[in-house]
């Protein structure tokens, strides 16, 4: 993609940074010059280093370079929310069929993305709904053909997680963690990634898959929450309690789950407290037999 070098040079010159400074001492300025002139490419690692040296966020660069899709599908998401609030699931199914029909004639990625978004909501609402092999293949190819992820790709992954089986969710998480741009991705999108890892943890626990639950717990522990990320800490405390129950220590697990609910009540987070109290009641009936 020859234009990437041109976009990089635009940011570098706009900030009055020399070629030597822009390399960050990581590679030669002649290599950077060839990249800017479209004569060669830079590895992802060198590009991240150079972007840091010219004080440019990865997402700022990807938007300017046209790598990141500006189409955020806000109109579609708003339409879906309206249907959900009106409890018109039949119309949501019709919307999916409409999107499916469009993709039978169109190869545009944005059309397939919209089809997947609607399918994801259907899967979340109805266990009987499953993504087709073609939809799953498209999602994987679309996400992992992008060299540099930004908020768009992460949000798309987050929205589409209901179409994934636990094994696929785990596979995608491993691929995200192995990306060269993961450190930057995590720094710029902590909430989204915290939510993703926690959802994987909760999914594994709900399916009573201790091996996968232990994996997601390790991921969470390696990228643990700051003190100002209290909500994540409380939900994680609750989920840990259920995993303890699943491993046979019912009294200890239920006590920990109750502790999380009590914290929500102390903080006057009544909606969250009521939601997790209901989950605690269900767990009590399940594990106290």
Predicted regions and their residues:
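Alpha-helical adaptor scaffolds
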Residues: 153-230
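Amphipathic alpha-helical segments of tetratricopeptide repeats
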Residues: 96-104, 138-144, 177-184, 217-226, ...
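DNA major-groove recognition helix of helix-turn-helix/homeodomain DNA-binding modules
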Residues: 45-60
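Helix-turn-helix repeat elements of alpha-solenoid scaffolds
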Residues: 85-98, 128-137, 166-178, 207-218, ...
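"A position-specific structural signal for the A-helix of alpha-solenoid helical repeats
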Residues: 7, 46, 78, 114-125, ...
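Short, charged recognition helix plus adjacent turn
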Residues: 63-90, 262
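A short, Lys/Arg-rich alpha-helix, primarily the initiator
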Residues: 1-14
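Short alpha-helical DNA-recognition segment
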Residues: 16-33
């Amino acid at each position: 993609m020859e234009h990437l070098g041109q976009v990089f040079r635009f940011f570098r010159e706009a900030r009055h940074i020399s070629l030597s400074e822009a390399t960050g001492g990581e590679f030669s300025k002649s290599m950077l010059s060839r990249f800017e002139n479209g004569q060669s490419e830079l590895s992802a690692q060198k590009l991240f280093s150079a972007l840091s040296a010219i004080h440019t966020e990865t997402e700022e660069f990807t938007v300017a370079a046209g790598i990141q899709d500006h189409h955020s599908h806000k109109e579609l998401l708003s339409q879906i929310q309206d249907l959900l609030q009106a409890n018109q699931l039949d119309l949501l199914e019709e919307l999916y069929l409409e999107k499916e029909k469009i993709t039978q004639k169109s190869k545009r990625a944005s059309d397939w993305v919209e089809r997947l978004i609607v399918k994801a909501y259907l899967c979340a609402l109805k266990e009987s709904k499953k993504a087709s092999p073609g939809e799953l293949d498209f999602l994987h190819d679309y996400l992992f053909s992008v060299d540099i992820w930004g908020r768009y790709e992460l949000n798309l992954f987050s929205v589409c997680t209901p179409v994934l089986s636990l094994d696929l969710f785990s596979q995608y998480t491993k691929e995200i963690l192995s990306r060269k741009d993961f450190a930057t991705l995590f720094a710029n999108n902590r909430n989204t990634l915290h939510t993703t890892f926690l959802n994987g943890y909760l999914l594994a626990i709900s399916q009573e898959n201790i091996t996968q639950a232990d994996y997601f717990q390790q991921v969470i522990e390696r990228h643990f929450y700051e003190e100002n990320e209290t909500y994540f800490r409380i939900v994680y405390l609750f989920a840990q309690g259920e995993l303890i129950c699943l491993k046979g220590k019912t009294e200890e697990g239920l006590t920990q789950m109750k502790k999380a609910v009590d914290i929500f009540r102390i903080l006057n987070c009544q909606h969250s407290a009521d939601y997790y109290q209901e989950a605690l009641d269900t767990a009590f009936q399940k594990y106290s037999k």
